[in-house]
C-alpha cells in the first residue's frame, strides 16, 4: 500500500463527519456529489493513491473520486465516510469472486490473509482473507471452526464431517486438532475414536 501524507488536509475529516455539506474546503473539493482531493504542494488531483487527513486514510480512484464502502486492492476497506477501517471485523459480499465472508482488518488496515491468527485471545483461520468456518483440513490435520470462526477445542457434538448424517461426539485437543483412529484418556476415562474422529460407545 503506497500512502502519502498531505498536511493541508488536516481539517477535511471534520467536513466528512459533518455530512459533507460544504462543497469545498482546504484541498478537498465536492463536485456533483463526489469528493476529490488536490495535492496542496502542486494543486494536482490525487488519483490511484491514498490521502491522510487528520490521522484517517482515504483512497482516491483512477478518476480521483474518494471511495466509500469499498474493498481496495482486496486488502483494505473504506467505510461509508471513506475512512480506512482498522482493528475490526467486516462482512464483505464479494459474490463476483465467490469470496463473500467475514474478514478482519488489523492495525495497519490490512486484512488478515492465509493461516491462523489470534484475535482477542481467540484463534481463527483465514483462507484468501476470508474467515473459515466448519470442518477444515490444514497441513494434514483436521480442525473444526465454530460459526463465529473460533477454533473448537474439547468435546463437541457435530454433524458427521464425511456424510453429514446424524451428529456424533468428537474431541479436539488444546491445539484444536481432531483426535481420531485411536484411544485417548480424558479426565481419567479412556475413549475410543474411529477413523473419522467419532467417539465409539
PLM regions with names:
Residues 2-201:
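Extracellular adhesion/carbohydrate-binding repeat motifs centered on closely spaced tryptophans
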Amino acid at each position: 500500500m503506497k500512502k502519502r501524507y498531505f498536511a493541508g488536509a488536516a481539517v477535511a475529516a471534520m467536513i466528512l463527519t459533518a455530512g459533507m455539506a460544504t462543497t469545498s474546503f482546504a484541498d478537498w473539493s465536492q463536485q456533483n456529489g463526489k469528493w476529490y482531493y488536490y495535492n496542496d504542494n502542486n494543486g494536482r488531483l490525487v488519483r490511484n493513491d491514498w490521502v491522510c487527513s487528520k490521522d484517517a486514510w482515504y483512497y482516491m480512484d483512477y478518476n480521483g473520486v474518494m471511495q466509500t464502502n469499498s474493498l481496495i486492492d482486496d486488502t483494505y476497506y473504506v467505510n461509508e465516510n471513506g475512512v480506512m477501517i482498522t482493528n475490526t471485523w467486516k462482512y464483505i459480499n464479494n459474490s463476483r469472486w465467490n469470496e463473500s465472508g467475514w474478514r478482519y482488518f488489523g492495525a495497519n488496515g490490512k486484512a488478515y490473509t492465509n493461516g491462523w491468527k489470534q484475535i482477542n485471545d481467540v484463534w481463527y483461520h483465514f483462507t484468501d482473507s476470508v474467515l473459515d468456518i466448519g470442518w477444515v483440513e490444514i497441513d494434514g490435520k483436521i480442525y473444526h471452526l465454530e460459526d463465529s470462526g473460533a477454533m473448537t477445542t474439547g468435546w463437541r457434538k457435530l454433524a458427521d464431517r464425511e456424510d453429514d448424517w446424524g451428529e456424533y461426539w468428537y474431541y479436539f485437543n488444546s491445539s484444536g486438532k481432531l483426535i481420531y483412529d485411536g484411544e485417548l484418556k480424558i479426565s481419567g476415562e479412556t475413549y475410543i475414536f474411529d477413523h473419522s474422529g467419532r467417539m465409539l460407545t
